[in-house]
Amino acid sequence: MTIEFSNFSFRYESLDKPTLRNINLRIEKGEKIVIIGPSGSGKSTLGQCLNGLIPHAIKGEVSGSLTINGQETATFAMHQFTEQVGTVLQDTDSQFVGLSIGEDIAFALENQLTSNIEMYSLVKATAKMVDLEQMLQRSPHDLSGGQKQRVSLAGILVDDVDILLFDEPLAALDPKTGKRTIEIIDELHRKTGKTVVIIEHRLEDVLHRHVDRIILMDDGEIMADTTPDELLASPLLAQYGIREPLYLTALKSAGCHLALDDHPSSLSELPLANYQHAMADWFHQANTTSNHIRSETLLDVRNLTYSYDGEKNALEGVSFNVQRGEFVSILGKNGSGKSTITKLIMGVIEPDDGAIYLNGQDLSELTIFERSQKVGVVMQNPNHMISHHMIFDEVAFGLRNRGWDEQQVNDKVLEVLELCGLSKYRHWPIEALSYGQKKRVTIASILALEPELLILDEPTAGQDYRNYTSMLSFIEKLNRELGITVVIISHDMHLVLEYTTRSIVIADSQLVADAPMTDVFSNPALLDQANLTTTSLYELATRLNMAETNAFMQHFIDVEKASRLEKTVERNVA
C-alpha cells in the first residue's frame, strides 16, 4: 500500500505560516521508515495528516495531495483513514476505550459487528502477538508503560490495517522496555509485511533493528531522505540538532573518520580494528583525578516505605541522601517507584513509614505550598501541570502568586523563555505546541521561581537533542554557578551519562545501588535488574578491550562537558 505526499502543505487555523511546506515523499508498501527532526519540525503534523486527524479533528488549510494506495485522501471520511492506518499515540492513556485489555482490543471489531465467536478468537490471537494473552481481564490503566504500548498496538493490529504509524513510541519507556518495543515492531514488520512509519527522537534506540530509510525534517520541510548509513556518515545530525549514537560521538572525539562503507549505523558491523590505535591515544589523554567534593546534606530520605493499595509496596525501606550542589539521577524501570519518591517529597502523598528531611527539617511539618517554595518539581507529563491558555501566562503564574509587579514578572518570564528556547513562542496558545515544547514550558515555569532543589521527572521525554541539551546545559550552569541541587528521575541513559555524577537505582520498590554513575553504567547485571541497558559507549569500550571501562567512560563524559562549556562561552561572547 503506497503512501505519496505530492507538494503537500498544511497550515493550522491558529497560525499565520504553514507547519508543513511542499512535502514530497513516497513510501512503498512494506517499507519501514523513521521520521526524525527537532521539536516543532512538523513530524507529528505529518503523521496526523497520514492518519486523518488532519483535517477531520484538527482544522487548517491543506494544499497539494496525499494518496494512499493510489486514492486521493482529500475526499476520505475518517473511517476510511482508520481502515488503512493504525496509530499508536505517544500518550497511550488517551487511546484506551475499554475497561479491560480484552475490551480495548475488541473495540474495532465491535464497531464492525463482528460475531462474538470470531471476535474472541481474533482478540486472543492478536493479544498473543504482543505477549498479552494472559492479561486480557486486567485494566489497561494498571499496566506499565511498555504494556500499555502493547495494548495500543494490539488495538490496531486486530483491525488488520496495512499501515502502522508510531508517534514517539519510546518517549515514556525505560531502555529495556524500549528495546523490546523496537523488537516487537520489527517482528511484526517481518511477519506481516505491513508498512511501518515511526516518528521518534531516540534514533540510536530505533536503529536497534534495521530500517529502510530515515526522513529528516526541519521547519516543516524534508531535509534528507536517505539510508541510516548515509545519514550517520554525514554531518546532518549535528547540523539539525539530532543526537547521534554515543559510540559515534566517542569515535569522532578521538579523531576517527567514519566512512559509508564502515556501516556506521551498526556498532556490531563497524571495523573497530581500524580505530584501535586512535582510541587508545585518545584515552591516554584522560585525567583520572576526581574533583568531586561532598558538602552538607540537603535532602535526606530515611527508610521510606509507601503502598498505594495497602498490599504491595511501591517503595520499601528506601534510604539515600543528596548533598547540596550535587547533580544526581534516580534510575529504574517503569513502575519501580521512582515517581513515587517525587510525590512523597511534594507532599501529594504521605509515607507509610520513614521520613524525608530538607536542610534538616522534617518535610511532614510543611504544607504543600511551603514545600513548593523550596522544591521545584517538573512532572513527567506536561499536561498535568499546565493551567493557562497562553505560554506567557503559564510561566508567569507562580511569580504573580508571589505578588511580583508586572514589570518584574515580564522581565523574569522573558529571561527564562529565552534560556529555555521559547522566546519566539511567548504569544502562542499552549495547544499549538508539540509535546516536547509543552515540556519546556513547564520547566520554564519552575525555573522562574528559582528553587533550592530542582527535581525533573523524565525531562527528555518528547524532547529533541538540541532543545534538551540547551535546557540541561542551562540547568547544569545553575548547578555549577549558583549551587542549585538537581535530581533527575529518568531512564534516559544518555542523559544520565552526560549530566549526572551519581546514580541512585531503584528496582522492584527497593534501593539496589547508590554509586558513582560510571560504576552503575559498567555493571550489566545491575542494569538488567533495574530494566535498564548498557550504553553503546560501554559496548564500544568492551569491544575495544579497554581494561579500564569506567575510566574510559569518565573520559568521554569529561570531554563532552568541556565541549559544552566551550560552546556556552562562545555563545556568551557572540
From Swiss-Prot:
Q: Where does ATP 1 bind?
A: G37, P38, S39, G40, S41, G42, K43, S44
Supply the alphabetized keyword list. Answer: ATP-binding, Cell inner membrane, Cell membrane, Membrane, Nucleotide-binding, Repeat, Translocase, Transport
Tell me which InterPro entries the record gives: AAA+_ATPase, ABC_Co_transporter, ABC_transporter-like_ATP-bd, ABC_transporter-like_CS, ABC_transpr_CbiO/EcfA_su, ECF_ABC_transporter_ATP-bd, P-loop_NTPase
Q: Which CDD domains match?
A: ABC_cobalt_CbiO_domain1 (cd03225)
Alphabetized PROSITE patterns for the sequence:
ABC_TRANSPORTER_1, ABC_TRANSPORTER_2
SUPFAM superfamilies referenced in this protein's UniProt entry, alphabetically: P-loop containing nucleoside triphosphate hydrolases
Ranges of residues in domain ABC transporter: 3-244, 299-533
Quote the record's binding site residues for ATP 2: G332, K333, N334, G335, S336, G337, K338, S339
Molecular function GO labels: ATP binding; ATP hydrolysis activity; ATPase-coupled transmembrane transporter activity
Q: Name one GO cellular component term.
A: ATP-binding cassette (ABC) transporter complex
Q: What is its EC number?
A: 7.-.-.-
State the compartments where it is located.
Cell inner membrane
The highest taxon in the source lineage is Bacteria
**Principal cellular location given in the protein's record:** membrane
TM ranges: none
Q: Which Pfam families match?
A: ABC_tran, DUF3744
Membrane-topology annotation of the record: Peripheral membrane protein
> What does the UniProt record say this protein does?
Probably part of an ABC transporter complex. Responsible for energy coupling to the transport system.
**Similarity remark:** Belongs to the ABC transporter superfamily.
Return the protein name: Putative ABC transporter ATP-binding protein VV2_1533
Gene source species: Vibrio vulnificus (strain CMCP6)
